[in-house]
Every structure is written in structure tokens, then in C-alpha cells.
Regions:
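Long, compositionally biased, glycine/small-hydrophobic-enriched stretches that function as flexible linkers
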Residues: 1-216, 371-520, 524-536, 542-546, ...
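Catalytic or ion-translocation cores adjacent to nucleophile or general acid/base/metal-coordination motifs
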Residues: 205-228, 232, 239, 244-247, ...
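Short, solvent-exposed amphipathic alpha-helical segments in soluble enzyme
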Residues: 265-267, 330-334, 415-419, 525, ...
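Residue-level detector of anion-binding/catalytic polar loops
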Residues: 270, 335, 398
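Glycine-rich beta-alpha junction loops
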Residues: 278, 320-323, 342-347, 403-409, ...
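Active-site/ligand-binding-proximal alpha/beta "capping" segment
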Residues: 315-343, 350
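Glycine-rich, charged/polar anion/phosphate-binding loops
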Residues: 323-326, 385-386, 517-521, 565-568
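Small-residue-enriched alpha-helical segments and adjacent helix-cap loops
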Residues: 538-568
Length: 673
């Protein structure tokens, strides 16, 4: 066989193999992943991984890759992981020919920080399976490409594989990312697992493979907003009050779910969060994201109820199964005001959901030795979990699905009574998604979403200055209660000690707020007040994700099953010159259940960046508001009408004429029955 690669490539892995790294004790490791490969598939997976390796080392590395595939279900290329701790260093410590190339390296390494990543050695940032890329060969090669990237080139990355550098121009994206995009017939978990094991598909979740994760802070503000608005809408709490004296119960203290306790505390509630993995509880307790920890149901309940009675906030981490907790609370007649779940139910059979009666360690062992038996136990626990929620609902508890596919997992396990129509999931479920009931109408329909930024200097003073600038802007543009909530959030953000990893901030803002803050920050960079900044957002946004069980669950015109909004948003951000953009399959809710995209935008203080911001920031938000308006969402229609007036002669969004329901029903009865 003729190998043309060596002479034809100048950007490649080093010829000499790195020394096999040491694995530090005390860090979580991913369980064995499911794949069900044939012998031919296994050979293909090894052959695929060897594409990154010089032929002189194929015999040695083929054996290592085969061992990894057997033990872990995936080829991670552990030998190629850099020795020691990875973290997002100050931007000046990175090599690169353009600022974007260096900035993106900061964000990649931040995703793999031991203090942030769920399974750092397996490149999993959060969400049980959300990876930066598939393996450490890809990581090293991406870094090499970013070091060579110029401001007239674009790096293309497909499911973690750096396809190459291609000539573009200064106003084009520097990196274009896609993760796990599959042809429809094969777009399911089984086929994805095979593709991932073969080394051709990466599950990027949202900001894991999109290189924009900022630690659990990234979801705290959204969870805070959700809890606060749930209290207003469902418990009758006035807009100027918080959740003092209320009890919130949920499950999960991982990369995203870890925000629950902190958000509940900031919102003033007493809370109990169940988590089976004690190491995750340890992480959140050390970081100050939960205030108490215990393996005793009695103690957890007493702490929470004592705080609730005094109207004081608390976040109690209960080390145990959520179903055990619910049984105990129910049998002891404890009233729960708000209830949810943030276990990784987008992959319930891959370790995302732990069956009742198993410890976390037993769960991991059973996944490896008896995956079929594990599946049976998961289904049994899901059924019981659902039964307990129904019992609490009868007592007046408000339960909402937090978009983790919990209700879909219950349905997939064989429970049809969870469906609104009693048969299938086309009309949704009897319990609402938090987007359907709360976040959609209260925030997304207005354009409010999870805007974020990272100070690339890693200097806390830069973050403080941007916090103050944001607070000043919002205070001067206080139009409705959402603005006041956001003002209080950013005003107190530093006090609430939210930073884990690089100096980043999450702040819900609407289209104009995002654009104006972005322009202000770029001006501050230009004036030398702060160092470079990178902007982004969660894919979980008004226009970033099409997901009928979550982000688009409050779209009621039938288009909730369409994936065109997220795709158009991604393409539009590319056309307008965002620094890097990403489009993924299955973020949050699982493969085949979502198409989601995001971006990163580097602020270097230039007028070029100002131009891009003025074009891209309104688009990135308003594409979602426009779609929601066309679905006849009232708040979105109001927002679009205001936008059309504001941008008259520049932008114009189509709005719906409203038809009378009675007329449509009458015509159907008269002419179509």
C-alpha cells in the first residue's frame, strides 16, 4: 500500500510517540460504552484510529487501540493525552498566528479542566457522554491546526476530526464545527453508538463539542430563572419576592445538573438534590455549590425543612437514589412545592440513570458485565419514579421536566399513560417541559437567553469590570421583570462565587441586550480597560436548538418536529462572520431528538468585530423569536412587531394573521368530516 500522507502533510502528529501518561487518582472515569461491534467493525475501528498514526508505529498502537476498544467500548488514544492538568490558561500563553486560534485553545482546555470535566480522561465535559472530541489524537491535531491558523483560513472539524485548513477571508469564521450529524434513516442511538465506536461520530452535547462550556455556572442562571418563574406562575409568588419558605426537590449534581442547588439557594428556596455519585457531591460541596451533604434521608429532610421553616435558603446534597428520597418524603407527608429531575436521561441505558437498589459503583460494574439486565432495572426504576411523581402531583406538587428526556425515557420504557393522547408522544406528555410552561413564554419568546462571555486573560478584575458594565446597562434599560431579575443576577454574581475554571459569566439577555453589551465589551478591549473577551451562548436558546421535548416544546403549530431554525441560525452566524460556529445532533435530549447549534465570537477591540456584532447578535436571537412569532406565540409576536419598527428599512420579519379557532373547527366539521 502506498502512503502519500507523510510527504503531503506538514500539519500532523509528531513522529515520536509520547510516553504513556500517568492517570491521577481521584478523578472520575467514564463507564464502558455500548457498541455491539462485529469482528469486522472492530478491525475497522482500529484501522480508522491508525489514520492519525505514522505507519512505523501501527503494530504497537493497533494493540493499544484494540485493548482500549475492548475495555472501554471506544478508542480514546490515552497515550496522546498531555501529561498533567489541562486548564484554560491566559490567552498569551498559547501559540498561534491569529487571536481566534489562541482563544479557541483556551476554551477547549477549559472544557477539559479537572475541576470542570465530568470524565476528563475520556474528554467528556458534561452530560454523561458530551465530548470535546473523540480521542486524544484529535485533540493534539486540532491544537496543531489552531496554532497554524491565520485570519484568512477556516478550520473544518467534523465530529472531532480536523478535516483541514481552507482558504477563506478575514470576515469568515475561523472554525466550523459539526458533531454527530447523521442521515435520517440511521439517526438513532444504536446506530450512533456503532458510529462512535468506529471513530466517525462524536456526541458534542451542546457546549462540550461546541467548545463553549463555562462550568455549571452556564446553567445556573437559567435554572434560577426557571425556579423563580415557576414560583410566580404556579405558586402565586409576587414578582418582587423569591422562593423563601418553599421546598424544591430534584436529582443530579453533574456538569449541568450541578447548578440546581446553587440556583435554588440564589432563588431563596430550601432544596434537596439526590445524587448517586459521591464524587460529584464532593466536587459541588468543595466548590460551595451545595451547602450540606449527607447519606441520611432523615438528616437531609430535617436540614431542608428547618431552613424552609425559617425562610432561609439551603442546598442539601443527598447521596442516594432520587426514588428512595421521594418515597421517604411521601411516606413522611412532606409537602414539596417544586420538583424536577436532571439525571442524564438522554442516555438512560449508558449510565445516565442509576436504578434503585444499585450503588453508583454497582451501576458501573453492571453496565460492563450485564447491560441487558441493567436496562431492565432502569425501566423498572423509571416506572416507579413516574408513579411517585404522580402521587406528589396529586398532593399539589408542581413537577416539570427539565429537558433531560426524563419523560421521554419513561415513555420509551413502555409507559403510555405519560402521553397526553394516551398513545404516543406526538402531542407531548402530561407533565410539561420547563420550556413549554415557563422558559419559553417568559424568556425565549422575548428573546432572553443564555448569553455568556469569558475573559481570556483569566484575570478576575476583567470579569468584575464586565459585570459592572452589564449591570449598569441593564439598570438603564429596565423594561420588565425579566430585566430586573437579570440585573440582580449580574449585580450579585461575584458575591455568589459562580466561577469554576476560566473567568466567565452567564447572563440572560435579549437581542438588543446581547448586541449592546457585546459592543460595550469590545469598546472596553479597544480602550485597554480589559483584555480580549470571547462571547458565546448555550445552544439551549431561543433560536439555537430545535428539540420538540425541550427548546421548541412551546411551539404549537406542528413545526416543533422541524430542525430548520437551528440550522438556519448556524448558517446565518457563519455568513455574518462569527469566530467559530457549531451544529450538533441530540444536545440535551439525545441523538435524533434535537439539532442544536452555537457560536464563539472573539472580541479584539477592532472595528471589524463591531461590524460583525451588529450583524450577527440580533440575527442569532431574532431568528428564534421570529419562528416563535410565526407559531403564534403572543410574547414573540409583540417582540417581532417592536423589532420590525426598530429595524425598519433594514430587517423585516413576516408575522402571522390570526385565525379564529371556532372558524377552523367549523369548516372541518362542515366540509372535511
Amino acid at each position: 500500500m502506498i502512503n502519500l500522507a507523510d510527504d503531503a502533510m506538514t500539519i500532523k502528529l509528531d513522529y515520536e510517540l509520547p510516553e504513556y501518561p500517568k492517570f491521577e487518582e481521584g478523578y472520575r472515569r467514564a463507564p464502558r460504552r455500548e457498541s455491539h461491534l462485529t469482528e469486522a467493525d472492530k478491525a475497522l475501528a482500529i484501522k480508522n484510529a491508525l489514520r492519525y498514526i505514522h505507519p512505523d508505529h501501527h503494530e504497537q498502537m493497533a494493540k493499544e487501540f484494540a485493548q482500549e476498544l475492548e475495555e472501554h467500548g471506544r478508542i480514546y488514544g490515552y497515550r496522546f493525552r498531555p501529561e498533567g492538568k489541562l486548564y484554560g490558561k491566559p490567552i498569551d500563553e498559547y501559540k498561534g498566528k491569529c487571536i481566534e486560534g489562541k482563544a479557541i485553545q483556551v476554551m477547549i482546555d477549559n472544557n477539559l479542566d479537572f475541576d470542570i470535566a465530568l470524565y476528563p480522561y475520556e474528554l467528556v465535559t458534561y452530560g454523561e457522554t458530551g465530548q470535546v472530541c473523540q480521542n486524544w489524537m484529535q485533540y493534539r491535531l486540532i491544537k496543531k491546526y489552531l496554532e497554524q491558523l491565520t485570519d484568512e483560513q477556516t478550520l473544518v472539524v467534523m465530529s472531532g476530526h480536523p478535516l483541514g485548513l481552507f482558504h477563506s477571508h478575514k470576515m469568515a469564521p475561523r472554525v466550523i464545527i459539526s458533531n454527530g450529524l447523521m442521515v435520517g434513516t440511521f439517526d438513532d442511538q444504536e446506530n450512533f453508538n456503532r458510529a462512535a465506536a468506529l471513530g466517525v461520530a462524536n456526541y458534542g452535547q451542546m457546549t462540550a463539542g461546541g467548545w463553549m462550556y463555562i462550568g455549571p455556572q452556564g446553567i445556573v442562571h437559567g435554572t434560577f430563572n426557571t425556579l423563580l418563574n415557576a414560583g410566580r406562575l404556579k405558586l402565586g409568588i409576587p414578582n418582587d419576592q423569591n422562593l423563601a419558605g418553599r421546598l424544591f426537590v430534584s436529582a443530579g449534581l453533574g456538569g449541568m445538573s450541578g447548578a440546581q442547588g446553587k440556583a435554588a439557594e440564589i432563588a431563596g428556596a430550601a432544596s434537596i438534590i439526590a445524587e448517586v455519585d459521591d464524587s460529584r457531591i464532593e466536587t459541588r460541596y468543595t466548590q460551595g455549590w451545595v451547602s450540606h451533604r449527607t447519606a441520611s434521608l432523615e438528616e437531609a429532610t430535617k436540614i431542608a425543612l428547618d431552613h424552609q421553616k425559617e425562610g432561609k435558603p439551603c442546598a442539601v446534597a443527598y447521596c442516594g437514589n432520587i426514588v428512595d428520597l421521594l418515597e421517604y418524603l411521601y411516606n413522611n407527608n412532606v409537602h414539596v412545592d417544586l420538583m424536577s429531575d436532571q439525571t442524564s436521561c438522554h442516555v438512560p441505558y449508558d449510565g445516565g440513570y442509576c436504578p434503585q437498589g444499585l450503588t453508583f459503583e454497582q451501576r458501573t460494574e453492571m453496565l460492563d458485565k450485564d447491560p441487558d439486565g441493567f436496562r431492565v432495572l432502569v425501566d423498572k426504576t423509571l416506572h416507579h419514579h413516574y408513579e411517585m411523581i404522580c402521587k406528589f402531583h396529586e398532593r399539589g406538587t408542581y413537577f416539570f421536566d427539565y429537558g433531560n428526556s426524563f419523560l421521554k425515557a419513561v415513555y420509551d420504557s413502555g409507559v403510555k399513560s405519560i402521553c397526553k393522547n394516551g398513545e404516543n408522544d406526538l402531542d407531548g406528555f402530561i407533565f410539561p417541559s420547563y420550556v413549554e410552561d415557563i422558559l419559553g413564554p417568559c424568556l425565549f419568546d422575548f428573546g432572553y437567553g443564555p448569553f455568556r462571555w469569558c475573559c481570556l486573560s483569566r484575570n478576575p478584575e476583567d470579569l468584575h469590570k464586565t459585570d459592572m458594565a452589564a449591570a449598569e446597562y441593564i439598570k438603564a434599560h429596565n423594561r420588565r421583570y425579566q430585566d430586573y431579575d437579570n440585573y440582580v443576577w449580574v449585580r450579585d454574581a461575584e458575591k455568589n462565587k459562580l466561577v469554576v475554571g476560566t473567568q466567565c459569566r452567564i447572563l440572560y439577555q435579549d437581542a438588543m441586550g446581547r448586541m449592546n453589551l457585546a459592543l460595550k465589551f469590545n469598546e472596553m478591549v479597544r480602550n485597554g480597560e480589559i483584555g480580549p473577551v470571547i462571547l458565546g451562548r448555550d445552544h439551549h436558546d431561543t433560536g439555537g436548538t430545535d428539540a420538540p421535548f425541550r427548546e421548541t416544546s412551546n411551539i404549537k403549530d406542528g413545526s416543533n418536529i422541524m430542525a430548520e431554525m437551528a440550522t438556519q441560525c448556524y448558517a446565518g452566524n457563519a455568513a455574518r462572520g462569527m469566530s467559530y460556529i457549531a451544529l450538533h445532533n441530540g444536545g440535551g435530549t439525545g441523538i435524533g431528538r434535537a439539532i442544536n447549534g452555537g457560536f464563539g465570537m472573539v472580541l479584539d477591540g477592532s472595528e471589524r468585530v463591531d461590524t460583525i456584532l451588529r450583524m450577527s447578535m440580533p440575527w442569532d436571537t431574532m431568528v428564534g423569536v421570529a419562528r416563535r412569532s410565526w407559531a403564534r406565540n403572543e410574547n414573540a409576536m409583540t417582540t417581532v412587531a417592536e423589532y420590525n419598527k426598530m429595524y425598519e428599512g433594514q430587517d423585516h420579519i413576516t408575522m402571522p394573521y390570526l385565525a379564529d379557532d371556532a372558524l377552523c373547527e367549523k369548516v372541518v366539521k362542515e366540509y372535511l368530516d
